[in-house]
């Protein structure tokens, strides 16, 4: 048997639940043959696929090494832990969960420090006054260095944080922090605020592909099938299917509907009997149905879509372009 296609997903908590739900919505059911405590699984109905349950940081490391083909992990971990990430991995698709911003946060008492330029001035003055560099507590060492360098901030020292980073200024181990936040409530509770231009990265969970993985014809085909499921589900989420039939339905009316409502005609124009199927953005449904009824339609039905499968697969095309580059 050939080497399996390996998909790495988070091993616990909300990230695992969200990842499994994401794949399930795309028609890809992840199953653990050994029960909930098993760290290996499969995708039901797909042969020679191994699902590896790992921590988010382990997933990033395995993607860098090429020991997994696809992994679900946060962009923040990819950017922090993989040098030249854009050359070694591809962010195939943002999954819409695990959202968090990597930010620069300073004490609320620093009323004159609103931007990174202000911080540059303060760090220079701090060193002159205290004969030491200002301390920045963070787990994101590489992201911090890159972001600070891009803003010309050099008079600082990183204090690597192993725990609750937001508490570092209060206990005196750092003057400011770089950390992740979702709502900012924890920062505010610790007397901190984000600089106006201090959002370093808006992160979310991504489906990530590794360049170093063993990309055979078989594993590429497995990737195509997985990405076809995901793209089909995503495409379906953008539209509702609208059906109607009336004698006044013609190509000119269809062209007007396209222009006004952004509809797609997946099966072409109206049939000889006036039967028409359209895919319509949800926000345009009422306007479209009123338009069709105003031109003679007696009945307009609306159907939710589970999958819309096109010949073109933009996600697989993105993967192929990355592997060729």
Swiss-Prot record:
Catalyzes the condensation of ATP and 5-phosphoribose 1-diphosphate to form N'-(5'-phosphoribosyl)-ATP (PR-ATP). Has a crucial role in the pathway because the rate of histidine biosynthesis seems to be controlled primarily by regulation of HisG enzymatic activity. This is ATP phosphoribosyltransferase. Transmembrane segments: none annotated. HAMAP family: HisG_Long. GO terms for cellular component: cytoplasm. The gene is hisG. It is found in: Cytoplasm. One of its GO terms (molecular function) is magnesium ion binding. It catalyses: 1-(5-phospho-beta-D-ribosyl)-ATP + diphosphate = 5-phospho-alpha-D-ribose 1-diphosphate + ATP. Belongs to the ATP phosphoribosyltransferase family. Long subfamily. SUPFAM superfamilies: Periplasmic binding protein-like II (SSF53850). Keywords: Amino-acid biosynthesis, ATP-binding, Cytoplasm, Glycosyltransferase, Histidine biosynthesis, Magnesium, Metal-binding, Nucleotide-binding, Transferase. Pfam families: HisG (PF01634). Its EC number is 2.4.2.17. It is an enzyme of class 2 (transferase). Pathway: Amino-acid biosynthesis; L-histidine biosynthesis; L-histidine from 5-phospho-alpha-D-ribose 1-diphosphate: step 1/9.
């Amino acid at each position: 048997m050939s080497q399996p296609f390996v998909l790495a997903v988070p091993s616990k908590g909300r990230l695992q639940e969200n990842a499994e739900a994401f794949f399930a919505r795309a028609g890809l059911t992840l199953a653990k043959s050994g029960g909930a405590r098993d760290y290996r699984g499969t995708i039901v109905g797909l042969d020679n696929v191994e699902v590896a349950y790992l921590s988010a940081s382990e997933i990033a490391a395995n993607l860098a090494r090429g020991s997994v083909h696809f992994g679900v992990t946060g962009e923040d971990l990819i950017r922090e832990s993989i040098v030249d990430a854009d050359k070694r991995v591809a962010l195939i698709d943002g999954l819409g969960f695990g959202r968090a911003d990597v930010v620069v946060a300073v004490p609320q008492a620093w009323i004159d420090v609103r931007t990174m330029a202000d911080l540059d001035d303060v760090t220079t003055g701090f060193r002159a006054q205290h004969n030491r560099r200002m301390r920045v507590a963070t787990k994101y060492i590489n992201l911090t260095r890159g972001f600070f360098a891009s803003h010309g901030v050099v008079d600082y020292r990183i204090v690597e944080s192993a725990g609750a980073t937001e508490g570092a200024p209060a206990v005196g181990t750092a003057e400011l922090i770089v950390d992740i936040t979702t709502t900012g409530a924890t920062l505010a509770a610790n007397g901190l605020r984000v600089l106006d231009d201090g959002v370093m990265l808006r992160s979310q969970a991504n489906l990530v592909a590794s360049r170093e993985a063993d990309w055979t014809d078989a594993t590429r085909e497995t990737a195509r099938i997985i990405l076809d499921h995901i793209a089909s589900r995503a495409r379906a989420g953008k539209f509702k299917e609208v059906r109607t039939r009336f004698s006044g339905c013609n190509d000119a009316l269809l062209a007007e509907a396209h222009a006004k409502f952004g509809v797609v005609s997946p099966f072409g124009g109206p049939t000889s009997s006036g039967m028409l199927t359209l895919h319509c953005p949800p926000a345009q449904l009422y306007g479209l149905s009123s338009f069709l009824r105003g031109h003679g339609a007696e009945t307009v039905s609306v159907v939710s879509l589970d999958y819309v499968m096109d010949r073109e697969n933009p996600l697989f095309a993105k993967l192929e372009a990355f592997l060729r580059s």
